[in-house]
Amino acid sequence: MTHAVTLIVNGRRHQLEVTARTALCDALRDDLGLTGTNLGCEHGVCGTCTVLVDGESVRSCLVLAAECDGAEVRTVEGLAADDGTWTPLQRAFHEEHALQCGFCTPGFLMLLTGALERGEPIEDPGHLDRLLASNLCRCTGYVGIRRAAARAAQETRGGEGA
């Protein structure tokens, strides 16, 4: 049995037919072709599938697509401007060498984008530690990710002095 759902993904309205068991990550990847949302553990542990649903960071492997009917969903593909201009966070990830293999990067970008947009104090080391503990990276050791987060917070909140 399928259910009709409407998702507003990266500003575009999509009508989908999904089963009751279709995870949001599968709807994004398989039905909409948005493969930037990676699947790692599929148990909500690693954070690679993090997207924003109505502004909140969620593990798309744990959320059913049907639960998101009418919701605004933002994926990593929806971060850059239409002309390809990067966000301050994307630029900081590049400049601070905050990625290596890149598999976890979309999840970190979405996690940190949500935190920045909600005004969370990610420049506070303790808060950033708690936030980053929710996503896993096996390559970077988190140093570049921490620098990128602080740089993006400074640039977004304090002007271009980053």
Named regions from a protein language model:
Residues 1-162:
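Signature of N-terminal electron-transfer/Fe-S-associated modules in redox systems
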